[in-house]
């Protein structure tokens, strides 16, 4: 077998503001040269066909218009435009709120864009050939998630360290992510970047039935099925605030919140 037919993912175990978690599957967004070219959210609220933020108030709609205006300034007025944009953004935070405590840019559980982009990139990688064509069978795909020192809260870049002392590995990235998500204290069925990887597709990422996943561990309580793991004690990561109250498992220990 050609080395080009095998790929590996070595992600950190982290929360993510746009997808809830970033693990094996989300890690491969890094195959692109510049992530600024990738779609991460859609302008507006769900009512208007977007996933930028959940509410439909006039204030939020005005913010969307203002953001578009600022971006046009940056593009059309080089150098000066960037400085003007910095000033406008600083003033805008006083009116519309700062990003660290205001849902915007798709940083919440209603983001319906980033998970799609992520799965598309995974398909490009595991089915794509160097000449731009696609193969009929997927390449082998190994994942080893590093959860020795993980990240919770404002992931993927500004979160808090969380010592877990674990590695989670396997040959099916969706299955590995499902187990990792459960250990984080989250319901994988609430995270599209995980559960949609099991969906039927002409280029499937996983053809595994999640109910057949068998967990092998040196920790006895974690051995067995996903349903059994759900009932055990977890690490109970603090999710990004835009995902709080939506993805936690029923037995999640909220006393860990920061």
Model-derived features with residue positions:
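Extended, low-polarity segments enriched in aliphatic/aromatic residues
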Residues: 1-258
